[in-house]
């Protein structure tokens, strides 16, 4: 399903996070296998330091992209959105931290899903520039 759903258009229905800890502005595309989101970094973001989004902020944005996919799947199945946790971060690589005002575009693609555990590859770009990759192991609770 491809669409542009912005923060004022029900992203809160798909992810459990709430302001000021929401790191997605737009859900560009979502399916059972992947999600594509965007986030323009505001100066007052809680994980901004010295004009840059922190590594923790990059990781949280990737995790929320994964949560958007999971929330969409849960909604398609008639379920409520479940709370999820990062169980492991593997192979996190960054070329730089993004600056305030830049827009992150992150794709999360499911590698493996077993019951409530997902292994997801995440790629984050600013424009055409690849700035971060990681593999997240995520768990949801019932």
Language model features by range: what are they?
Residues 4, 68-107:
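Hydrophobic beta-strand-centered segment that forms part of the acyl-chain substrate-binding groove
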Residues 19-54:
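Catalytic strand-loop segment that frames the active site of acyl-thioester-processing enzymes
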């Amino acid at each position: 399903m491809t669409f542009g759903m912005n923060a004022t258009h029900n992203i809160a229905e798909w992810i459990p996070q709430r302001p000021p800890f929401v790191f997605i502005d737009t859900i560009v595309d979502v399916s059972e296998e992947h999600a594509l989101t965007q986030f323009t970094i505001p100066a007052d973001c809680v994980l901004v330091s010295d004009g840059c989004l922190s590594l923790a902020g990059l990781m949280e944005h990737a995790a929320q992209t994964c949560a958007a996919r999971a929330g969409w799947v849960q909604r398609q199945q008639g379920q409520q959105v479940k709370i999820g946790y990062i169980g492991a971060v593997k192979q996190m690589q960054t070329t730089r931290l993004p600056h305030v005002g830049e827009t992150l575009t992150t794709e999360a693609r499911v590698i493996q899903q077993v019951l409530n555990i997902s292994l997801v590859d995440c790629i984050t770009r600013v424009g055409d520039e690849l700035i971060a990759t990681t593999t997240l192991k995520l768990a949801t609770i019932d």
